[in-house]
Each structure stands twice: as C-alpha cells, then as structure tokens.
C-alpha cells in the first residue's frame, strides 16, 4: 500500500486557471521525493493538496489507503496529525519561544483550551526537547524564535514536524530564502530524519543540483502535468530541460543568487 496516492487528481481555480491535470502518483513509505518545475507549474498546489491546504476539484488523494479527500471532522484531524508541514517562510509565532513553537506540533493531540493555556504534558515537552536536539538547536529552546537566524528558524519548523510524530513531512520550498551553507544544513537535517527515522519526505525544490543530491526520486511538473517521474540518479540535464521546457540556467543548477 502506498503511503500517498494521487488518483486522477485535478485542480481548477475559480478564475479558470488549471493548477493540476489528472495527476496519478504513488509515494512509497521512506521515499525522499522531490517535485521540480518552473514557478507556476503546480508544485505548491500538488504538495498542499496532500493535507488539504488546497482542496482538489476532481480525483482523490489517499493517505495509507484512506481517502483524505473525503475525510471530515475528527477523521480529517487525525489524518492531518500524521502529516507535518514545513513552509518557505517558517510559519512560526515569532514572539514565542523556540520550545513553545515546537510544542505547537502537539496541538492535534489535545483539547484546544489546553493548548491555548499552554498546558502541555511533561511527555510532550520531552518530545519537543528530543526534536530540538535532533536538529542541533536544543541550546536555543528558551529564546524567542525571531532572535534566531533563518536557518535556525527552519530547523524549528523541522523540529515541530518531528514533535508532531508525523510519518510524512511536506516541505514547500524550505530553502528558497536561505544562503548556500544554511541550505546544506537544513537539507542534511531532512535527509537525516528520512534515513534514520524512515519519515517520508515530499519536497518542492527550485535548484536542480539539490534535487539530484538529496532526492531518491524526481517528479517533474510542467503546466500542472507530470512530465517526468523517475530515480534521481537518472535525472540528467536533458531531463530537467524537458521539465522546464528550456535549457537550465546556471543559477538554477547551482542554487546561487
């Protein structure tokens, strides 16, 4: 059974723009699958449809054999609990401490009123500290999140997903705003948790070299359609040119500004 299954998935926006066209994909447990394509190709739409941040127009998406497309209420909450999300701009509460931001990964496990009051059980705090240690920022746990660098804030986001105990992590351009050194650190963290914990990673990346270095599988989107799906080791420059519809530029290969 695939961990994520897209079956005939399409998305049409109210203005008539087609975001996704008849997507059929199976993402297996433990994969590090990278979605690539030009801006507007449908990468974020595809990624965000998995946890229903974007609802699809037709088709169906399954998580471990259960339809998240048809899920509602408690069933949807429980399915989302298993799907961590990492955003390009971190999506942290800036004035809150690092620890409090990581603990927000536990909100799906407790009544809302307890979370509003910050009444997290001791076990949750232990999970949060363990997650921070795994991404090497445990020493920052009591600092305000906005006092940290961009790379450190993205590591808080990763720790939050780990604290959530997600079996799937969706990462939407997580290194787009980071410098090359910090990019490597964040990508190394994602690869480490993928390899050591078996967490499935589905990630959007802009840079070709990063996709080939870290991905086990490349999924190429062009105008909302899958135009390539195969091992990262077989994704040549010619393949990327097909995905992009033109020759790849040097700054798209190397990830430099």
Swiss-Prot record:
Q: Where in the cell is it found?
A: Cell membrane
The UniProt entry's GO CC annotations, sorted and at most eight, read: plasma membrane
SMART domains, per database record? AAA (SM00382)
- What is the membrane topology noted in the UniProt record heading this document? Peripheral membrane protein
Coarsely, its chief localization is membrane
Q: Which GO terms describe its molecular function?
A: ABC-type phosphonate transporter activity; ATP binding; ATP hydrolysis activity
Domain (ABC transporter): give its ranges.
4-248
Give the matching PROSITE patterns: ABC_TRANSPORTER_1, ABC_TRANSPORTER_2, PHNC
Q: Which Gene3D superfamilies match?
A: P-loop containing nucleotide triphosphate hydrolases
Q: What is the documented function of this protein?
A: Part of the ABC transporter complex PhnCDE involved in phosphonates import. Responsible for energy coupling to the transport system.
Q: Which family is this protein grouped under?
A: Belongs to the ABC transporter superfamily. Phosphonates importer (TC 3.A.1.9.1) family.
Q: What is this protein called?
A: Phosphonates import ATP-binding protein PhnC
Q: Which organism is it from?
A: Staphylococcus aureus (strain MRSA252)
Name the gene for this chain: phnC
């Amino acid at each position: 059974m695939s961990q994520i299954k897209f079956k005939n998935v399409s998305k049409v926006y109210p203005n008539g723009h087609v975001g996704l066209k008849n997507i059929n994909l199976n993402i297996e447990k433990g994969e590090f699958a990278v979605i690539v394509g030009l801006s507007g190709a449908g990468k974020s739409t595809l990624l965000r449809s998995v946890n229903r941040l974007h609802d699809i127009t037709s088709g169906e998406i399954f998580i471990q054999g259960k339809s998240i497309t048809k899920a509602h209420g408690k069933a949807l909450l429980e399915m989302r609990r298993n799907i961590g999300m990492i955003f390009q701009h971190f999506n942290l509460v800036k004035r809150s401490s690092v620890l409090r931001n990581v603990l927000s990964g536990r909100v799906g496990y407790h009544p809302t009123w307890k979370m509003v009051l910050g009444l997290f059980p001791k076990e949750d705090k232990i999970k949060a500290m363990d997650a921070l240690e795994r991404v090497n920022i445990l020493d920052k746990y009591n600092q305000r999140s906005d006092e940290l660098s961009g790379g450190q804030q993205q590591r808080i986001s990763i720790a939050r997903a780990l604290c959530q105990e997600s079996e799937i992590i969706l990462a939407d351009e997580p290194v787009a705003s980071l410098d090359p050194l910090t990019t490597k650190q964040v990508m190394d963290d994602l690869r480490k948790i993928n390899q050591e914990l078996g967490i499935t990673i589905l990630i959007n990346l802009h840079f070709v070299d990063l996709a080939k270095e870290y991905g086990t599988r490349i999924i190429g989107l062009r105008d909302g359609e899958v135009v390539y799906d195969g091992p990262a080791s077989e994704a040549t420059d010619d393949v990327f040119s097909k995905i992009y519809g033109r020759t790849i530029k040097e700054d798209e290969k190397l990830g430099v500004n």
